[in-house]
Amino acid sequence: MEKIAIVTDSLSDIPEDLIKTYGIFVVPLTINIDGKSYKDGVDIKKEEFYKLLREGKMPTTTQASPVEFMEVFEDLLKSFDYVIAIILTSKFSGTYQSAVIARDMVDKNRIEVIDSRHFTLGNGMLVLKAARMAVEGASKEEIVSTVYETIPRIRGIMVFDSLDYLYRGGRLSRTQSIIGGILNVKPILTNEDGELKVIDKVRGQKKAIRWIIDYMKNTGIDFAEREVGLIHTDKEEFLNEIEAALRSELEITRFIRSQAGCGIGTHAGPDAAGVFFEEK
């Protein structure tokens, strides 16, 4: 049986217990605050980060470097036959390109680098699928093929309080960001081929939850048999309300719940929540 290591970046926001359970290797991005740099999920705790964010600090992110990936790849190839790295969308960060450079410098034949075209738990769910397959003994080719087949089937819905963080980070135009400043209006965003797009806006959290439920019902999926990802930045009460509605109206019982790390929090702000799932 092939020994396969699964690698991702810190913006996949996989819960720590699942990272340990499946032996996933995470390469952190760098968070910059007031002239100091921190490794996402390593040098700064989420609680401390979101406290700073609510105090008005405006952090930035720096992609993981080729050298950081090289060190991880070289170390893993000492004990694994292959490495599969599933990285957040290349349209959001240069981290994917860093991983590609590292692959080319270490061993192109034993390292596969995949542009997930997703972010946060959209990417995380792909990583978890790959990691579970690796544990079950699937081959490198089987895992890579399944991940590529799954990429277009992952759907994500994010509800933001403000789009200012995305605008300041260069991930959204000024025109798109304006609607987030209207009192109690919740912008709803989704992923379109690796980019965040504002697709609607509603007034208040209850209508945002209703929008999510209606969207998911319209897919025609029997969610009672599906695993659904739930993510929040620093808005757990809102996420609890979303989960309760999903359990009640769609009979969902299997969830991956996570708090977004500093990387996603930098661009989403402290008051965002989202739902991720795989279509048919």
UniProtKB/Swiss-Prot annotation:
- State the Gene Ontology terms under molecular function: lipid binding
Q: Where does hexadecanoate bind?
A: 61, 93
Gene3D superfamilies on file: 3.30.1180.10, 3.40.50.10170
InterPro entries, alphabetically? DegV, DegV_C, DegV_domain_contain
Q: Where is the DegV domain?
A: 4-279
Function description: May bind long-chain fatty acids, such as palmitate, and may play a role in lipid transport or fatty acid metabolism.
**What NCBIfam families has UniProt attached to this entry?**
DegV
Name of the protein described by the UniProt record: DegV domain-containing protein TTE1491
